[in-house]
Swiss-Prot record:
<dbReference type="GO" id="GO:0003729">
    <property type="term" value="F:mRNA binding"/>
</dbReference>
<dbReference type="GO" id="GO:0045665">
    <property type="term" value="P:negative regulation of neuron differentiation"/>
</dbReference>
<keyword id="KW-0508">mRNA splicing</keyword>
<feature type="modified residue" description="Phosphoserine">
    <location>
        <position position="458"/>
    </location>
</feature>
<dbReference type="GO" id="GO:0010467">
    <property type="term" value="P:gene expression"/>
</dbReference>
<dbReference type="GO" id="GO:0006397">
    <property type="term" value="P:mRNA processing"/>
</dbReference>
<feature type="cross-link" description="Glycyl lysine isopeptide (Lys-Gly) (interchain with G-Cter in SUMO2)">
    <location>
        <position position="217"/>
    </location>
</feature>
<dbReference type="InterPro" id="IPR035000">
    <property type="entry name" value="PTBP1_RRM1"/>
</dbReference>
<dbReference type="GO" id="GO:0045944">
    <property type="term" value="P:positive regulation of transcription by RNA polymerase II"/>
</dbReference>
<dbReference type="GO" id="GO:0003231">
    <property type="term" value="P:cardiac ventricle development"/>
</dbReference>
<keyword id="KW-0010">Activator</keyword>
<feature type="cross-link" description="Glycyl lysine isopeptide (Lys-Gly) (interchain with G-Cter in SUMO2)">
    <location>
        <position position="64"/>
    </location>
</feature>
<dbReference type="GO" id="GO:0001069">
    <property type="term" value="F:regulatory region RNA binding"/>
</dbReference>
<dbReference type="GO" id="GO:0003697">
    <property type="term" value="F:single-stranded DNA binding"/>
</dbReference>
<feature type="modified residue" description="Phosphoserine">
    <location>
        <position position="140"/>
    </location>
</feature>
<feature type="modified residue" description="Phosphotyrosine">
    <location>
        <position position="126"/>
    </location>
</feature>
<dbReference type="GO" id="GO:0045727">
    <property type="term" value="P:positive regulation of translation"/>
</dbReference>
């Protein structure tokens, strides 16, 4: 039982069996005009969402919310994963329903929070799929507030398409969130350099970053970072506070600043105004105006070196970090795609976000496979998008199950978080960590039928070079594929014909304007794109060119 919600129809009280049959019909969840009863002590039980995570749906059920939680905080749970299209608040029951724009976004969100316990206001909350496929809400006061908050967020997100977001959108977001769009960031245990660019890459995943100033105070590397809106600042703080950038060090402490905007005078390696590319570089040292200095009780000019000072304090114990610091975090954060310098550190074995750099079980159990079509090679290619696959074993007596051994635990987490729930050969695969620590090769003479393969020395490994740029381009499965290593003689029609030859539908194609060795191709569905990647990655295009295929974050 997941608590209490109103009757689905107005004016009639249904028995539990009738209500349950309505819930599992996968119709829309209609929030009736009796919504206020649900926020009081109504006793009608809702039996629809009684599973652990459930069957994927755009609608997500959130339970055990703090009684004083705001609509904005609930919306912020979904923002890192895509657009939130509807919200239903049941405050009296400490519950909510979030509707995402796509099932893929909802699936990524649930996968993430399955690994990383979500925390709001210091309280763990619970997230699972709802039986409902969409939400419909009425105009009761509680739902009106939720819709107003949702509209404010959407207007801000629309404004984010341009760096200079409209003042109205920013004001709407400010009114909803009630805080500054400026974050104060302290990096503790600074054993590796954290540059302005690293901060920009990490924090840009939560919204448009307008300005950053870095400085050193009290022997601590600090930064002020201004978003285009306070909603982005809010969910960046919720998601990143207490996280480690690199393994067991460089811990982020994040608070809201008293400032509402930053005044950046120079664009250099210490400060940057992304809305003003015309600013001079100055002397590579940012200066804070007197208002800012007063806010920090600091002199106008901060220390020239952000890495000065040898004594770094121990990691600050943030309650929220306790909810985030679990072994699965590295993989769970992967849908947010923290790239570039941080990913390069991952390739060098330093990334931690938090506490997992090569540690943990590297063997995955993959189930619900199509036994008629799955092969070790297809699993090697697909899982190889997220790490270097060492061995694959399809179980001899249960061919719908397989073991996939990655190079380390972080790669296993990455593959699991991105691929769990996606369709392969017409079936939604399920991926969990295996109890096995390695995949055993068959003994000599043991019947295997080619179901176990060793790929330890495969030339197709994408991440074998330390610091490989491929770590910067890891994305969830999508309908759009990134193609590279295309020879000059191969045309758009050639590639379209190649990708449609296996029954897929090509919906769009575009060569890169500056480099015709690369292109984007859009398939008819995510499942078609997955199949095309498996079949055509490393395809021989002639002229000693083998096609490279990966998932893209872009669309055509």
């Amino acid at each position: 039982m997941d608590g209490i919600v109103p009757d689905i129809a107005v004016g009639t009280k249904r028995g539990s069996d009738e209500l349950f049959s309505t819930c599992v019909s996968n119709g829309p969840f209609i929030m009736s005009s009796s919504a206020s009863a649900a926020n009081g002590n109504d006793s009608k039980k809702f039996k629809g969402d009684n599973r652990s995570t459930g069957v994927p749906s755009r609608v997500i059920h959130v339970r055990k919310l703090p009684s004083d939680v705001t609509e904005g905080e609930v919306i912020s749970l979904g923002l890192p994963f895509g657009k939130v299209t509807n919200l239903l608040m049941l405050k009296g029951k400490n519950q909510a329903f979030i509707e995402m724009s796509t099932e893929e976004a909802a699936n990524t969100m649930v996968n993430y929070y399955t690994s990383v316990a979500p925390v709001l206001r210091g309280q763990p909350i619970y997230i699972q799929f709802s039986n409902h496929k969409e939400l419909k809400t009425d105009s009761s006061p509680n739902q009106a507030r939720a819709q107003a908050a949702l509209q404010a967020v959407n207007s801000v997100q629309s404004g984010n398409l341009a760096l200079a977001a409209s003042a109205a959108a920013v004001d709407a977001g400010m009114a909803m969130a009630g805080q500054s769009p400026v974050l104060r960031i302290i990096v503790e245990n600074l054993f590796y350099p954290v540059t302005l660019d690293v901060l920009h890459q990490i924090f840009s995943k939560f919204g448009t970053v307008l300005k950053i100033i870095t400085f050193t105070k009290n022997n601590q590397f600090q930064a002020l970072l201004q978003y285009a809106d306070p909603v982005s600042a809010q969910h960046a703080k919720l998601s990143l506070d207490g996280q480690n950038i690199y393994n067991a060090c460089c811990t982020l402490r994040i608070d809201f600043s008293k400032l509402t905007s930053l005044n950046v005078k120079y664009n250099n390696d210490k400060s940057r105004d992304y809305t003003r590319p015309d600013l001079p570089s100055g002397d590579s040292q940012p200066s804070l105006d007197q208002t800012m200095a007063a806010a920090f009780g600091a002199p106008g000019i901060m220390s020239a070196s952000p890495y000065a000072g040898a004594g770094f304090p121990p990691t600050f114990a943030i309650p929220q970090a306790a909810g985030l610091s679990v072994p699965n975090v590295h993989g769970a954060l992967a849908p947010l795609a923290i790239p570039s310098a941080a990913a390069a550190a991952a390739a060098a074995g330093r990334i931690a976000i938090p506490g997992l750099a090569g540690a943990g079980n590297s063997v995955l159990l993959v189930s619900n496979l199509n036994p008629e079509r799955v092969t070790p090679q297809s699993l090697f290619i697909l899982f190889g998008v997220y790490g270097d696959v060492q061995r694959v074993k399809i179980l001899f007596n249960k061919k719908e199950n397989a073991l996939v051994q990655m190079a380390d635990g972080s790669q296993a987490q990455l593959a699991m978080s991105h691929l769990n729930g996606h369709k392969l050969h017409g079936k939604s695969v399920r991926i969990t960590l295996s109890k096995h620590q390695s995949v055993q090769l068959p003994r000599e003479g043991q019947e295997d039928q080619g179901l176990t393969k060793d790929y330890g020395s495969s030339p197709l490994h994408r991440f074998k070079k330390p610091g490989s740029k491929n770590f910067q381009n890891i994305f969830p499965p999508s309908a759009t594929l990134h193609l590279s290593n295309i020879p000059p003689s191969v045309s758009e029609d050639d590639l379209k014909s190649l990708f449609s030859s296996n029954g897929g539908v090509v919906k769009g194609f575009k060569f890169f304007q500056k480099d015709r060795k690369m292109a984007l191709i859009q398939m008819g569905s995510v499942e078609e794109a997955v199949q095309a990647l498996i079949e055509l990655h490393n395809h021989d295009l002639g002229e000693n060119h083998h096609l490279r295929v990966s998932f893209s974050k872009s669309t055509i």
